[in-house]
Amino acid sequence: MPFTGATRVLGIIGQPVSHSLSPLMQNAALQAMGLDYAYVPFAVEEDCLADAVRGLAALGVVGFNVTIPHKSAILPLLDRLSPEAELIGAANVVKREGSDLVGYNTDGTGFIQSLSEDLGFTPAGCRILVMGAGGAARAAVASLAGAGAASVVIANRSIARGEELSAAFRRHFIGTQFAAIPLDPENLNRCVQNFDLLVNTSSVGMGGTAFPGMDLSRMGPHGAVYDMVYVPAVTPLLAEAERCGIRYANGIGMLAAQGECALELWTGVRPPEGLMKACLMAALMS
C-alpha cells in the first residue's frame, strides 16, 4: 500500500530500536487488514525523550510503542495513564485521544495470553516464581496476581529490590501472597518443587548466554517454565526444562500478543489471529 498524505503514522520509540521486530509484525498486520497506516521505528536518546514526545504529538502521530529505556521515564510526560500502566509504573503503549497522550501497558495482558496459548497455563490458584525485579517483572507480577495466583515469589540478585516490589503489590492484591528471595541457583534448586510456574523476566539467557547452575529436575512434569527471552528460541533455561520433561515457552508469544493489544487500541480493530506471531517466528528462523 503506497504512503500518501492521508496515511496515519504509528511507531516505536526506544534506544536502540534497530533490532526491534515490532515494525515487521505491525506493518504486516496493517497491510493484511487493509488499513492506511505506517509503523515506524524512532531511535530516541534518554535526554531527548521529552522533545521526542512533544514532536510526535505535534506531528499528529496516532500512537506509538515505548521500549527500553523509556517505559517508566515517559510517564510524567503523558496526560493520563490507564489503571494498568499506573499500577505497573510503566507504559509500553501511548495513544493519542483528542489532545491527550494516554499511556497504557499491554505487556501484562500479552503475557497472560501467551501463558494460555503457548503453555495451556492458567495462573489462578497457582504458586509462581518470578526471576528478576525490573520493568518486565512488574508487568508479570501484576498480571499474575490479577489473574488470581495464590502466591508470587520474586527472586532477584538484590533482595531489597525484590522485597520492594513485593510490598508494592501486596497492597493491591490481598488475595495473593508475595515474598522475595535471593536469585541464587543453589537456593532456587532447593525450592523449585514448590512452584507450578517459573518465569524468567531477566536478560539472562539472551543470545544463548548460560543460565548458571539451574537444575529443574525437582520441579517435576506438573510444572511449567516461561522465559521472556526469545533469542535463541530455546534458551539455556528452556533447554534445562526440556531435559527434565517440563513444558516450556519463550517470549515470542508475549511479544506478539502485546502487539495485537496495542494495534487494537490504536485502530479499534483486532488483527488476524496468529498473524503477528507467524511473522515473528519466520523472521527469527531466517
UniProtKB/Swiss-Prot annotation:
Q: Which residues bind shikimate?
A: S20, L21, S22, T67, N92, D107, Y230
UniProt xrefs under InterPro entries: Aminoacid_DH-like_N_sf (IPR046346), NAD(P)-bd_dom_sf (IPR036291), SDH_C (IPR041121), Shikimate_DH (IPR011342), Shikimate_DH-bd_N (IPR013708), Shikimate_DH_fam (IPR022893), Shikm_DH/Glu-tRNA_Rdtase (IPR006151)
**Positions of the catalytic residues:** K71
* Presence of keyword Metal-binding: no
Query: Which parts pass through the membrane?
Result: none
Recorded GO MF terms: NADP binding; shikimate 3-dehydrogenase (NADP+) activity
Q: Where does NADP(+) bind?
A: G132, A133, G134, G135, A136, M228, G251
The UniProt entry, under PANTHER family, shows: BIFUNCTIONAL 3-DEHYDROQUINATE DEHYDRATASE_SHIKIMATE DEHYDROGENASE, CHLOROPLASTIC, SHIKIMATE DEHYDROGENASE
Q: Which family does it belong to?
A: Belongs to the shikimate dehydrogenase family.
In Swiss-Prot or TrEMBL terms, this protein is called Shikimate dehydrogenase (NADP(+))
Species in which this protein is naturally found: Geobacter sulfurreducens (strain ATCC 51573 / DSM 12127 / PCA)
Organism lineage reads as:
Bacteria, Pseudomonadati, Thermodesulfobacteriota, Desulfuromonadia, Geobacterales
